[in-house]
Amino acid sequence: MLYTYAGPEISVATTKAYSTQLIGTYMLAICLGKARGLIDEREEQRLLAEIAALPEKVQRIIDDKERLQWFAAKFSNAKDVFFIGRGIDYAICMEGSLKMKEISYIHSEAYAAGELKHGTISLIEDGTLVIGVLTQSELYEKTLSNLVEVK
């Protein structure tokens, strides 16, 4: 059993539990990679530094209230929200879509960017908010190309 020490969850969207599970899994992956000789000391330190930088990055997003309020006002009438991503970003899209439904009660779906041409693109109407998740540099251009298609 891997304890995350998240403490009691008080949010319907379980953001704290989800976030700590991700960090716990990431830490476990680092330890396993090191134990198997797939990650050296330098790479381990780089990955741990990324984790240590997360609180500051999250705080910058929280502090950007003006921009967040602008986005919320601009898209507050959206009836549908689609999250689009490839690879591991698709998993992030599924969680983002779930959070959107749980918190805002707006219809939301997650789609693999490569599957848009197979009928999904026809569901995107005027006023649909499409959120692209692009965290993998090797898939950036392909995903961006898919997002341009839905514009």
Segments the model singles out, each with a brief description of its role:
Residues M1-K151:
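A SIS-like phosphosugar-recognition module
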